[in-house]
Each structure stands twice: as C-alpha cells, then as structure tokens.
Amino acid sequence: MAWPCISRLCCLARRWNQLDRSDVAVPLTLHGYSDLDSEEPGTGGAASRRGQPPAGARDSGRDVPLTQYQRDFGLWTTPAGPKDPPPGRGPGAGGRRGKSSAQSSAPPAPGARGVYVLPIGDADAAAAVTTSYRQEFQAWTGVKPSRSTKTKPARVITTHTSGWDSSPGAGFQVPEVRKKFTPNPSAIFQASAPRILNV
C-alpha cells in the first residue's frame, strides 16, 4: 500500500470528528486556563468581564516599564459611537454641518464596546530614538565567523612574452588555465597527470 490510511478523506473526516473540540474552541482572549476557573458556569462570561480593562491595558499604579513592542502596538480603546464625518462633507448641499455636529457632540451610547485603534505615525519621537531593543542588545560571544564560499580565482599562465601586437598572428597562443586542486584523501589514485595503467 503506497499511502497510509490517514491520508484518505474518510479517515481524515473520522479523525476530525473525534478531535477534542475544547482544544480548538478556547477563546483567544483567555491567556490561561486559570481564567476559566474564575468564571462561574451559567453566568455570562462576557457580562462579568465587561467592567474589567482589556488584557493589553496596564494598571496605573504599576512601575513596570513598557517594552518597545507595547509602545509601538499598544491598545488604545475609544468608545464606539457614530463616526465623525470628514470636515466639509456633511449631509446636505455645500457641506454644511447642521446635523453632523449635533451627532458628533452626542456622548457615546452606554455599554458601547471599545474599539482598538492602531497608532498613526510616530507618537513619541523621544522613545523612537533609543528603543528598548537597542538598550537590551548584547553581541554574541564565542561565535565563529562563517567560512566564505567564494572560490579562489584560478591562476592564468601566459606563455607568450610579446608586447602589444596589433595582429595576433602565429605567435599568439591561448593562455592555459591551471587550477590548483586540493588532494582528495578518499581517491584511489593520486596521480598528478593522467597515466596509462598496465593492468
């Protein structure tokens, strides 16, 4: 049999049906299985977690410095309400802002979810000058430099010593290219030139 049975579609379908679905269905917001124990079964997990800050947020009382990754890709939450239209493009003719300014000044609806906003541009230029990656960098010690894979150029031996001839006549010879071979210890015969062996 060329292929094992697991490669057949019927066996694959049977294998996927027998998988433990709890391994696949773990929500991405949980960082450990201890979070599952803290929730009470039967009550809404989303309702109990709504008052808590998101997982990426930090406590203001902590003195732990932010890493460069957290500075670059930190999560800022903004209330999800009606979006402000771009200026000059409000509803109606001529871009008047009669209704749109009233909508944008309204507070967001209670219970609105937070929207993750990525930073645009360089938020703090002072942090970009010296990053934590540069501060934590240590050069590796004890690492050998890699050998170069470049082949050494072959030596070109010319046999003619004539000066600059305008016409390469009978005195012109093609230069010989001799390559220096390294001895091969696994070779049977270490002959410098091909010889005829009497057997």
UniProtKB/Swiss-Prot annotation:
Organism: Homo sapiens
Molecular function GO terms recorded: calmodulin binding; microtubule binding
Disordered: region residues: 33-110
Modified how: Palmitoylated. Palmitoylation enhances association with microtubules.
Description of how the protein assembles with itself and partners: Interacts with calmodulin.
Family: Belongs to the STOP family.
UniProt cross-references to InterPro entries, sorted A to Z: MAP6 (IPR007882)
GO cellular component, one term: Golgi-associated vesicle
UniProt keyword annotation of Ligase present: no
Protein name per Swiss-Prot or TrEMBL: MAP6 domain-containing protein 1
Lipidation (S-palmitoyl cysteine): 5, 10-11
Mn 2: annotated span: 165-177
